[in-house]
Design a protein with these regions (language model features):
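Periplasmic-binding protein-like
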Residues: 11-19, 88, 92-135, 153-160
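Extended ligand-binding regions for polar small-molecule ligands
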Residues: 25, 29-43, 92, 116-154
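Beta->alpha turn/N-cap motifs
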Residues: 13, 21, 39-42, 68-69, ...
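Ligand-binding cleft/hinge of the Venus flytrap
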Residues: 44-65, 95-100
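Acidic, polar ligand-binding/catalytic clefts
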Residues: 1-30, 109
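Structural recognition of the beta-strand scaffold that forms the well-ordered cores
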Residues: 16-18, 36-39, 64-65, 83-86, ...
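Short helices/loops that flank or line small-molecule/ion binding pockets
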Residues: 3-5, 29-32, 68-89, 97-98
Length: 160
């Protein structure tokens, strides 16, 4: 927010752990000694570098960083990694829709976040127009319908 203007948050997101369906990994603790994939410069990658996750990261056999989401799936498909840390938005849209019988998402996650749109700091009028449109879409149920269609659940952020 120091460099960009931000819209109101519009999506709730989490960093999920995805494993092959037949994996014996059930919890974050089970990742010890395993190879974990993350997208480079992603929230998942960032979280593994934080002091709160120091012990988890130190216990991993290896953290492999990939340039994009597709490369991570390829590594999971070919069993070159044991697990992946990915955005819930991406995981729900891909794993749940395209490969529901291939992967499993752990109950535990690496953390929650909200998603917003970044704007040029001096573009306040455009940001306000986007916020207004998003508020209207939340109010009339459009955001909920889109979210349920593509994510399988309503992950919209609503004002309290």
């Amino acid at each position: 927010e120091k460099v960009y203007g931000m819209s109101k948050p519009y999506i709730n997101n989490s960093q999920l752990i995805v494993v092959p369906k037949d994996s014996d990994i059930k919890t974050l603790a089970d990742l010890k000694g395993r190879i974990v994939a993350v997208q480079d410069d992603s929230t998942g990658s960032y979280l593994l570098e934080q002091p709160a996750n120091k012990d988890l990261a130190a216990g991993l056999k290896e953290i492999r960083k990939y340039p994009d989401f597709a490369a991570i799936y390829m590594e999971l498909d070919n069993k070159r990694v044991d697990a992946a840390i990915v955005d819930a938005v991406l995981a729900r849209g891909y794993y749940d829709k395209k490969k529901p019988d291939t992967y499993r998402i752990l109950d535990e996650n690496m953390g929650d976040e909200v998603v917003a749109i970044a704007f040029r700091k001096d573009d306040k009028e455009f940001r306000e127009r986007i916020d207004k449109a998003m508020d209207e879409m939340k109010k009339d149920g459009t955001c909920k319908k889109i979210s349920e269609k593509w994510m399988g659940a309503d992950i919209t952020v609503y004002d309290k």
